[in-house]
Amino acid sequence: MARAVEILAQVYEKNRAARNTPPVPIDRPVVLANEHVVFELGKTTRVQVERAFGVAFAFPMRGWHTYAAREDAERRFLSLFYAESGLVALEYYVPKLAGTPSLSPRDYGAFRLTPGDVALGASTATLDERYVTAVGGPAPVVYAEAFEVRFPGGVAYVMGNGGRVERLGLYTAT
C-alpha cells in the first residue's frame, strides 16, 4: 500500500511540474481571419479594420473596440485592443453576460483561428496537437476548458465549456 501511495505521489508531482511549464512556441504567428481581414498582432492596424468593418463600439471598457458579428445565425462579439494604432489583443466570443450591449450583429463572414482552423462552436476535442492545456492563463471561472498555443510575440487561447469552443483570444506577450 505504501508503495502505491509513493507511485501516485510521483505521478502527481511529475504532472504538476509539467503543467506549470509553458509549451514551446510554434514558428509562425497565430491569426484570426475571415474573407475580409487577417488579424495579426503587431501588423493589423485600426485603419485597416475600420475600413473593412466601420467604427466599433467601446466595450467591455474604454480602450476595447467591439463589433457584433453574426455567424451561424448566432450573435458573437469581436473585441480588439490597439496600442499606437497596431493590434495588441483580440477576443472573438459568444457573449455570455446579461448586460451586454444590444449591438445589431452584422454578417462579416466566418472567423477562424489559424493554424488549426479553430472556430467558435467547434469541439475542443478536435483541436490539433499545437493546442495544449493552458499554463497560467485564463482561470476556470467562466470557462471550464482553456487551451493555448504560444508563438513569437504572443499567445493564443481557446476557451470553452462542455466540449465546445466559446472564446478565442490573441494577446501580445509582454
Descriptions of predicted regions:
Residues E148-R150, G154-G162:
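Short, exposed beta-strand-loop hairpins at the edges of beta-sheets
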Residues M1-Y143, M159-T174:
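Short helix/turn-capping signatures at newly exposed starts of structured segments
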